[in-house]
């Protein structure tokens, strides 16, 4: 584990996390866009009720037919730009927080403290990085939710256009809409994502010699469980993001709590999990990130 005074080790952590994240996110971009559309279509001004996607398969079929095959990667560049610092900071700060929460803790004799320390370090790492990259996360969501068929029908021309338009209409608040519930969700997700993964690997006889497929299986289980548990928070935050830039008369949700209540009342609790199966499939990429990160660190 790199020390706090070891900048080389910190940079290696940053590079390994960022590179592995960029590769995996590009690979699963089509799945992520489908997931986002299923989550926010009920609040989208571009998708009429009669034109809403019926499910994951319907969405996969209609996107290339209506928007072109390359539309599967709409917003992917913004996602890579966002995800590189997000994941890199998550991994880098995770080890820093582990030194704070796990310093001097023996995993064999202090398992409870070891487990809680891993949960805390993972959650704090996710929350810290989110503070820095939230506007990029916001823009990625809005670009992916843009279903305009041509340049003129698109709501935003690109990442810069999205950020500038929202900033002009709503200011910085618009770019950080949904931040509160995002922090709640990210702490829950990252706590499980890093906490359970590191705890499981820590219980192995020799993590450094563990076969890659064992690490992948552990990571797959972790990302699936973490994704499902935190999914409702993700749905609410993305619904809130969709309201930025709108006129007051077009605002549907008065706040985060009102959003939770409105979705549950009008659409049912199942609405919080729309696109969740796509998220499970996307989790394969998340599991790949964890394994690839460990492998890249061995090379660096």
UniProtKB/Swiss-Prot annotation:
One GO term of the biological process aspect: mitochondrial ATP transmembrane transport
One term of GO molecular function: ATP:ADP antiporter activity
Name of a matching Pfam family: Mito_carr
Gene3D superfamilies reported for this sequence: Mitochondrial carrier domain
Domain of life: Eukaryota
InterPro entries: ADT_euk_type, Mit_carrier, Mitochondrial_sb/sol_carrier, Mt_carrier_dom_sf
Cystine crosslinks: none
Ranges of the Solcar repeats in the UniProt entry: 8-100, 113-203, 214-299
Major location (coarse): mitochondrion
Region (Important for transport activity), start-end ranges: 237-242
GO CC terms: mitochondrial inner membrane
Annotated control of activity: The matrix-open state (m-state) is inhibited by the membrane-permeable bongkrekic acid (BKA). The cytoplasmic-open state (c-state) is inhibited by the membrane-impermeable toxic inhibitor carboxyatractyloside (CATR).
Motif (Nucleotide carrier signature motif): 237-242
Free-text comment on this protein's domains from its UniProt entry: The transmembrane helices are not perpendicular to the plane of the membrane, but cross the membrane at an angle. Odd-numbered transmembrane helices exhibit a sharp kink, due to the presence of a conserved proline residue.
Role: ADP:ATP antiporter that mediates import of ADP into the mitochondrial matrix for ATP synthesis, and export of ATP out to fuel the cell. Cycles between the cytoplasmic-open state (c-state) and the matrix-open state (m-state): operates by the alternating access mechanism with a single substrate-binding site intermittently exposed to either the cytosolic (c-state) or matrix (m-state) side of the inner mitochondrial membrane.
Family named by the database record: Belongs to the mitochondrial carrier (TC 2.A.29) family.
Assembly notes: Monomer.
Name of the protein in its database record: ADP,ATP carrier protein 2
Lineage, uppermost ranks: Eukaryota, Metazoa, Ecdysozoa, Arthropoda, Hexapoda
């Amino acid at each position: 584990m790199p020390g706090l005074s070891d900048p080389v080790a910190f940079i290696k952590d940053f590079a390994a996390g960022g590179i592995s994240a960029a590769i995996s996110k590009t690979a699963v971009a089509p799945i992520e866009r489908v997931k986002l559309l299923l989550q926010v279509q009920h609040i989208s001004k571009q998708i009429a009720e009669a034109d809403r996607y019926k499910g994951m398969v319907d969405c996969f079929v209609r996107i290339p037919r209506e928007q072109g095959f390359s539309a599967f990667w709409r917003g992917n560049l913004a996602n890579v730009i966002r995800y590189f610092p997000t994941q890199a900071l998550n991994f880098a700060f995770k080890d820093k927080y582990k030194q704070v929460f796990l310093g001097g803790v023996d995993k064999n004799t202090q398992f409870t403290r070891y487990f809680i320390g891993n949960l805390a370090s993972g959650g704090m790492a996710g929350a810290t990085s989110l503070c820095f990259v939230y506007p990029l996360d916001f823009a990625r969501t809005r670009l992916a939710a843009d279903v305009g068929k041509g340049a003129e029908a698109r709501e935003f021309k690109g990442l810069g256009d999205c950020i500038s338009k929202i900033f002009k209409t709503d200011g910085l608040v618009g770019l950080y809409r949904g931040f509160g519930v995002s922090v709640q969700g990210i702490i829950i997700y990252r706590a499980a994502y890093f906490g359970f993964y590191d705890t499981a690997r820590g219980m192995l006889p020799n993590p450094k010699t563990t076969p890659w497929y064992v690490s992948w299986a552990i990571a797959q289980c972790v990302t699936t469980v973490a994704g499902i548990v935190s999914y409702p928070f993700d749905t609410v935050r993305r619904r809130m993001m969709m309201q930025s830039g709108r006129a007051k008369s077009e605002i549907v949700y008065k706040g985060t709590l009102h959003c939770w209540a409105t979705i549950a009342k009008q659409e049912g609790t199942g609405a919080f999990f729309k696109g969740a199966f796509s998220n499970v499939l996307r989790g394969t990429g998340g599991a790949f990130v964890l394994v690839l990160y460990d492998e890249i660190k061995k090379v660096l």
